[in-house]
C-alpha cells in the first residue's frame, strides 16, 4: 500500500468517527443486515433499510460509498442511509472490495452485482425498482457514474466484461456528491504525485488507457439519466463537479447543480454526510426533493 493510501485510510477513519460520535439508530427504521450479494464473505454484504411502518413496495436508493476506493464500508454509512430511510425510501447500503488488495475494476463489478441483487430480490424486500436511484459520494459518485455509463455506452461496456448490461439496471436518476469523474485530467495535472495512488488502484503503474478507463465523464451519452450534482466551496474535488456539469449539459442530460457553502462558513468534502450540519441537511433535503420530482415522470 502506498503512503497516500495509508494516509487516506487513517484520516478518513478519524474524521468519520468524530462526525458520527453519539449517533443512535432511529427507532422508526427497520434494518435487514448482512445480506450476501456475492461470493466474498467479507465485502459482498449489504443492508436494507425500510421505514418501520411502510407498506407496499418503496422507491429504492442504492448507496455507493466513498473512501478513495481504499476505505469505507456499509457500517460507516449506516447513519446517512438510515436517515434516507426515515424519509420514506427503501435504502440499500452495501460494502464493496477495496484497493490495493482488490484493484479496479473490482469495485465497479461489485456495484454491478449489488444492483443485480436489488433487481432480482425486489419483490422479496419490498423494493420498487421502477423508481431506482443511485446516491454516491467521492469515489462512490465515480462508481455510480461509471456503472451507469457502462449500461448506456456499448463501447465503454466492452472494457468491463465482468459487468452485466441490462436495461433493468439503469437508474431513474443519480445523486452525485463531491465526486471524481475524470481521472485522466487529474493524472495529467498531478503527474508523479498521483502515480503511487493510481498504482494501488490499478495494481500496476498507470497507463493512459487504464486511467482513461477510470474516467466515466468521457463516456457519458445523451441518454444518461437525470443527475443532481453537488459540490461545495471546501471540496478538494470541486473542479470535477464543474467539469461533469459541462459534459452533462453538452450532452443534453438533465442536471441540477448545487455548490454549497459561504466564504465565512465553508463546507468541506462530503459535508452532507454530517447529519448535524445544517447545510448538509439542506443538501440532503434538496436531493430528496429531486428524487420525488423524478418519480413523477
Where are these regions (language model features)?
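Alpha/beta-hydrolase superfamily serine-hydrolase fold, recognizing
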Residues: 1-297
Amino acid at each position: 500500500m502506498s503512503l497516500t493510501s495509508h494516509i487516506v485510510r487513517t484520516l478518513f477513519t478519524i474524521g468519520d468517527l468524530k462526525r458520527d460520535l453519539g449517533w443512535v439508530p432511529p427507532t422508526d427504521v427497520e434494518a435487514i443486515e448482512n445480506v450476501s450479494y456475492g461470493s466474498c464473505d467479507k465485502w459482498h454484504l449489504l443492508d436494507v433499510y425500510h421505514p418501520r411502518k411502510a407498506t407496499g413496495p418503496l422507491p429504492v436508493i442504492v448507496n455507493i460509498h466513498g473512501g478513495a476506493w481504499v476505505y469505507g464500508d456499509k457500517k460507516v454509512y449506516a447513519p446517512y442511509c438510515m436517515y434516507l430511510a426515515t424519509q420514506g425510501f427503501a435504502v440499500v447500503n452495501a460494502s464493496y472490495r477495496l484497493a490495493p488488495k482488490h484493484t479496479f475494476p473490482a469495485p465497479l463489478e461489485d456495484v454491478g452485482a449489488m444492483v443485480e441483487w436489488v433487481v432480482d430480490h425486489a419483490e422479496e424486500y419490498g423494493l420498487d425498482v421502477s423508481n431506482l436511484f443511485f446516491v454516491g459520494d467521492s469515489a462512490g459518485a465515480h462508481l455510480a457514474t461509471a456503472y451507469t455509463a457502462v449500461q448506456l455506452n456499448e463501447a465503454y461496456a466492452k472494457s468491463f466484461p465482468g459487468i452485466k448490461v441490462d436495461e433493468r439496471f439503469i437508474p431513474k436518476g443519480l445523486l452525485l456528491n463531491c465526486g471524481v469523474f475524470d481521472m485522466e485530467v487529474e493524472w495529467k495535472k498531478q503527474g508523479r504525485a498521483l502515480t503511487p495512488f493510481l498504482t494501488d488502484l490499478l495494481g500496476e503503474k498507470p497507463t493512459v488507457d487504464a486511467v482513461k478507463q477510470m474516467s466515466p465523464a468521457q463516456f457519458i451519452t445523451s441518454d444518461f439519466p437525470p443527475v443532481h450534482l453537488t459540490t461545495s466551496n471546501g471540496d478538494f474535488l470541486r473542479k470535477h463537479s464543474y467539469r461533469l456539469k459541462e459534459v452533462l449539459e453538452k450532452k443534453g442530460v438533465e442536471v441540477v447543480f448545487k455548490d454549497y457553502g459561504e466564504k465565512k462558513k465553508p463546507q468541506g468534502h462530503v459535508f452532507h454526510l454530517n447529519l448535524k450540519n445544517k447545510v448538509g441537511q439542506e443538501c440532503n433535503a434538496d436531493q430528496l426533493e429531486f428524487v420525488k420530482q423524478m418519480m413523477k415522470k
